[in-house]
Structures are given as C-alpha cells and as structure tokens.
From Swiss-Prot:
One biological process term in Gene Ontology: pentose-phosphate shunt
Active site as annotated: K83 (schiff-base intermediate with substrate)
Protein name: Probable transaldolase
GO molecular function, one term: aldehyde-lyase activity
Coiled-coil intervals: none
UniProt function note: Transaldolase is important for the balance of metabolites in the pentose-phosphate pathway.
EC numbers, comma separated: 2.2.1.2
Taxonomic lineage: Bacteria, Pseudomonadati, Pseudomonadota, Alphaproteobacteria, Caulobacterales
Family: Belongs to the transaldolase family. Type 3B subfamily.
Gene (UniProt): tal
NCBIfam families assigned to the protein according to its UniProt record, in alphabetical order: fsa_talC_mipB
Amino acid sequence: MQIFLDSTDTKVIADLASTGLIDGVTTNPTLIAKSGRPMLEVIAEICDIVPGPISAEVAATTADAMIAEGQKLAKIAPNVVVKIPLTRDGLIACAAFADEEIKTNVTLCFSPTQALLAAKAGATYISPFIGRLDDYGFDGMDLIRDIRAIYDNYGYETEILAASVRNAAHVKEAAIVGADVVTIPPAVFSDLYKHPLTDKGLEQFLKDWASTGQSIL
C-alpha cells in the first residue's frame, strides 16, 4: 500500500518525507486556503520535496475550464496529478486528460457507481471519502470493498485512493479491504507506528542493557 500525505505544509511534508515512507501528497482548495500562499508556488515546492504523485485540484466547475486549469497545473512538474471533482463535467474533463496522458485523481466519491464511471473515464486514481461517509452513518469501508470488487471484475487500472482518513484504524481497514493508496493528515502518521507496549518494551530493554555495562560500538 502507498501512503500519501494530505497537506500543504511544506515543512511538515519535508520532515515526514525524510522517513522514506511517504509516496505522494494530496492537496485541496481548503488546504491551499489555509496555507495562505499562492497555489502554484505551493504545488511546485511540494513537487521538489516529494518525487511521487502530487495531487493539485482544479477550482473550475465546467469541463472546458477544468481542462484549461488542469493543463496549466500539469505543467508545474511531471509528477503533478490533476485532481477533479466527481461531477458530469469532471468526468468529461477526466476523459480528455486521459487522452492527453495527464494523470488524474477524481475526488469526492461517495458511491460505487461514481467510481465505475471514473474508471470508465480513465481516472488514474479514485478518491472515496471514508470519514465523511462515517460522519453520515455509513460504513466507508463498504464503499472501498464495492469499488475493489467492481474494478477487479472488469480489470480497471484506476487505483483506489482512500481519502478523508481520520485515524490509524481507517488505514488498517483500508489496507485490509484492498485500497491501493491511503492519504492521511500528518497527525495520523505517528499513530501508525506508536504503541504504548512498544514504548514499555523498549524502556525495559534499555534498562536491562544498561545494567550489563556493555557497548556495541
């Protein structure tokens, strides 16, 4: 499974990317707005930090305008993935980008049929929103299961990118049901490796080692 960061904080991205465990980055208009910086500048900087896929979202709502914006975003760097909403116009734009061999991330997916159409339109990634579905009383993992089954049935190459991930349990469950990628807020990253029993065990090991008076170096 690939792990992406959902962030526009370049300092945090650089820090976590230094672990070698971050495969890409996703952004959205809300995160760009919170950064208080010009979008193109932020995306270019992230692309320099992380060589993997960097999702940059269009702000337009019509197919022609999405295509124009996406073409501009794609010119920032070779690893830019154009992020587009799962609307009728978004699907039209997605198909156009596929013809131009521009990678796409179709976002705001909440149903299996939406994911089916995105795959038919040639999407590189489909982003089902797990946490958002949970907020409304649905099981977001059921959506990933259904999408996985549909894509496997017909051999679609569109990758499932689990989004709106809130915690380590979401990451675990997404991995179990077959998501190809998960994008997480930076705060969730440490939750993936921290465990109180690990800390307790390490504390005991270090105490026992110190009692030997030995040194490996």
